[in-house]
Design a protein with these regions (language model features):
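Short, well-ordered loop/turn and helix-capping segments at boundaries between secondary-structure elements
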Residues: 24, 51, 80, 103-107, ...
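Short glycine-enriched loops at secondary-structure junctions
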Residues: 13-15, 172, 264
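Generic hydrophobic alpha-helical scaffold/packing signal
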Residues: 7-9, 19, 46, 62, ...
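Non-catalytic terminal extensions of PLP-dependent enzymes
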Residues: 99, 149-166, 176, 183-343
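Acidic/His-rich catalytic or pseudo-catalytic neighborhoods
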Residues: 62, 167-170
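Catalytic-loop motifs flanking and including active-site residues across diverse enzymes
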Residues: 125, 171-178, 225
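Conserved PLP-enzyme active-site core in the AAT-like
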Residues: 1-154, 161, 241-242, 268-269
Length: 343
């Protein structure tokens, strides 16, 4: 049956790593797209599942910031097909202390310790995650597991169905340590407050951005958002010729980073803001002021925005090599390997 079940279902607004990790292991990927409300239709999931379905890997809320309130219906559909459900909780920043993966009937979940639990992204890292599974799946976990017998901690290696060791099984230790101390210092009530403030900050920013000329939220038929929002500059681009890349470059001059979106760009001219709980109202207002100035310039002097940034050591960065597997290399060893291959 394991060989027969060779398909993983995900959604286009789930984190791309959900599809990528499964694809690396040889699974065929089925991707569900959103309806007019920004969410995949349960009927589409019913059509996608079959005797070939191994599992569902989904992020909720998705990267639009929209929470799928029908998530238990999704897990039931997949379970009824004999498959498993994995919950990518990369966007848990707005859910801590409010809802859990188990309550949505997931079999597995994983958290980004480098994002939701105090460690900064740090230019794409240092990434590390915590994986949790139902009791029935423990025997399949990588080894070693750390267990506490009531008196001392110990490594456990005797898992009958284990996949064995994985590279870097300790994770990025500083990120793990920071996450542990942060969780213990915050406590249950503190973690819930983190989520509440993250949602509050995000919705404050959203209301302000919706007043900006040329900016809109994606999927406006669903007005509510959790901890982030996927916006669109489509109207701004149509009216001024200024693109989301141009706005991003201009924000650099004010000392701010503005992120667009994962690829492919389902939302046209996208930009995504996830304020988290860390920033004060004054800091958010400063960020919004930079964005407001950029929009004003776009309508009054679009070339000024298009030629930005002006206060950066790198005037323009060519991002195209990052989309070409033959050119990019994330380690020195990978770089040397590709150089040798070219020769």
């Amino acid at each position: 049956e394991g060989q027969q079940r060779d398909e993983i279902i995900t959604t286009i607004f789930s984190h791309p790593s959900d599809a990528a990790a499964a694809a690396v292991k040889g699974y065929k990927i089925i991707t569900l797209y959103p309806d007019e409300y920004g969410l995949p239709d349960p009927e589409a999931l019913k059509k996608a599942v079959s005797e070939k379905t191994a599992g569902l890997l989904i992020t909720n809320p998705e990267d639009t910031g929209i929470f799928n309130s029908k998530i238990r219906e999704f897990t039931k559909i997949v379970h009824d097909a004999g498959a498993l459900c994995g919950y990518d909780q990369a966007n848990a920043n707005g859910l801590l202390g409010i809802t859990r993966a188990k309550e949505a009937d997931f079999d597995m979940c994983f958290f980004n310790l480098h994002k939701s639990f105090s460690s900064p992204h740090g230019c794409g890292g240092p990434a590390t995650g915590a994986l949790g599974v139902r009791e029935s799946l423990i025997d399949y976990m990588p080894i070693p597991l750390v267990e506490f017998d009531g008196g001392q901690y110990r490594f456990r290696y005797d898992l009958p169905q284990t996949i064995g060791k994985v590279r870097g099984f300790y994770g990025v230790f500083p990120a793990v340590l920071r996450a542990y101390t942060w969780i213990m210092s915050m406590g249950a009530e503190g973690l819930k407050e983190v989520a509440e403030v993250a949602v509050l900050n995000n919705n404050y920013v959203m209301k302000k951005i919706q007043k900006l000329r040329g900016a809109e939220i994606s999927y406006p038929k669903t007005p509510g958002r959790i901890e982030q929002v996927r916006y669109t500059w489509e109207k701004l681009t149509e009216e001024t010729g200024v693109t989301t890349e141009d706005v991003t470059n201009r924000m650099v001059d004010f000392g701010f980073h503005l992120w667009s979106s994962h690829h492919p760009w389902v939302v046209p001219q996208p930009f995504t803001i996830e304020p988290t709980e860390s920033y004060s109202k004054a800091e958010l207002d400063e960020y919004l002021a930079g964005m407001e100035k950029t929009v004003k310039e776009a309508y009054e002097d679009p070339d000024k925005v298009k030629n930005a940034p002006y206060q950066s050591v790198s005037h323009k960065i060519d991002h195209h090599p990052l989309d070409d597997p033959e050119k990019w290399a994330i380690t020195w060893r990978a770089y040397l390997k590709k150089q040798k291959k070219r020769k």
